[in-house]
Amino acid sequence: MSLCLWKQCLDRLQDELPNTEFSMWIRSLKAKLNNNILEIYAPNKFVLEWVKDKYLNHLKKILQDYCGTNSPLIKFEIYQIYKENKLKKNIENNNNNKNEKLIWSNIPKFKNLSYRSNINKRYNFQNFVEGKSNQLARSAAFQAARNPGNSYNPLFLYGATGLGKTHLLHAIGNEILSYKYDIKIIFMNSECFVQDMVKALKNNAIEKFKLYYRSVDALLIDDIQFFAHKERSQEEFFHTFNTLIEGNQQIILTSDRYPKEINGVEDRLKSRFSWGLTIAIDPPEIETRVAILIKKADQNNVILSNEVAFFIAKHLRSNVRELEGALNRVILNSRFTHRAITVDFAREALQDILAVQEKIITIDNIQKTVAKYYKIKVSDLLSKKRSRSIARPRQMAMAMAKKLTNHSLPEIGEAFSGRDHTTVLHACCKIEQLRKENHDIKKDFLNLIRTLSK
């Protein structure tokens, strides 16, 4: 009964909350019904307080809908208490089990193993510039760092190159090491895991390899997509993954795409990547780009005016590395020529980059092209009209903007009369689905791609 009731609550919350919100705060909760008290267990105090503050009334309403006047009281606890109670039960149940399995988490963590954390001290949460495009990822990363093995395990961050995924991995490592000096952390690119495994096989040392990776407290792997088509490495990582999760050892992975979109990786691995929390990092919106430029300039002992920062941010939208590269060029030119950094100076220093940017497809261009194709007005696309003759072209334009530009979901939403980023995400998913089911939609999509790419 308790499981059934909690599942009904979860189903309602999943229907009524945005996906990212549900994944971030609700999915990690556990619950049981005890003497008409619904005990809800959160992975840590931060999540507990947040859920209590933001969702308690929502939960009460759902329980009242299902149970009427006999709806249970709600009590919040930290997940650790739940695990300890469960562990006591398991010990009692398995006390006479002589065939008890040996799991890797029970193996002593030998002191003579040397762990190379490879954590770069330059990257931390303090110098990570937060904005709408990355705030969920940053918050989840910080929680995982403060409660390794208990919050969001595994944590999977994905997004295009240069958006801060690697920065967050280093920040997690540095945060953990700041309060747990003796913790064993491995930070590496997935290709290093493959190379280590190949060396272990050549040297007949595969058991040492297994012990090395399965005895860590936190495993941070960057660019997991490079496991594609490496069957033996995937096999070994599959078992390592299972062992670490079973031992409550933290796993954090990054990729340039959503887990299910990683080609050449086994389905069973892709499924496990999504066991915990999966969060996208989008290209930064203009306010975040401006903040990044000013912060990076300050780190170089350069005072950058808001006007110049806005000028650069307006023309360079794709990723943080591109912004840093442009800023470094402006600073270098200023130092060589001994000229002040003004908008005109920045325009001159970046003239070749700006020339390339002008050829890039814009949201404005997409809106005009889509409106012309469907024989409607741009103002209709931006309006609140919901008729299919307007809503479908609007969704198509949003999907085009996501595919053909480097704008973040919030920025695309802003360009469509301030719509929420979840509306844009829904539009992209809807068009993707319709392209598979509806020949006319597929044809429209391809025709618009060709027109915009000329």
UniProtKB/Swiss-Prot annotation:
Region listing for Domain III, AAA+ region, in residue ranges: 118-334
Domain of life per record: Bacteria
Entry GO terms, CC: cytoplasm; plasma membrane
Record-level GO BP terms: DNA replication initiation; regulation of DNA replication
Region described as Domain II: 79-117
Keyword hit for Hydrolase: no
Subcellular location: Cytoplasm
GO terms assigned for molecular function: ATP binding; ATP hydrolysis activity; DNA replication origin binding; lipid binding
Chain intervals for the UniProt region annotation (Domain I, interacts with DnaA modulators): 1-79
Gene3D superfamilies: 1.10.1750.10, 1.10.8.60, 3.30.300.180, P-loop containing nucleotide triphosphate hydrolases
Keywords: ATP-binding, Cytoplasm, DNA replication, DNA-binding, Lipid-binding, Nucleotide-binding
Subunit description: Oligomerizes as a right-handed, spiral filament on DNA at oriC.
Role summary: Plays an essential role in the initiation and regulation of chromosomal replication. ATP-DnaA binds to the origin of replication (oriC) to initiate formation of the DNA replication initiation complex once per cell cycle. Binds the DnaA box (a 9 base pair repeat at the origin) and separates the double-stranded (ds)DNA. Forms a right-handed helical filament on oriC DNA; dsDNA binds to the exterior of the filament while single-stranded (ss)DNA is stabiized in the filament's interior.
Record text about domains: Domain I is involved in oligomerization and binding regulators, domain II is flexibile and of varying length in different bacteria, domain III forms the AAA+ region, while domain IV binds dsDNA.
Protein name from the UniProt record: Chromosomal replication initiator protein DnaA
Species whose genome carries this gene: Buchnera aphidicola subsp. Acyrthosiphon pisum (strain APS) (Acyrthosiphon pisum symbiotic bacterium)
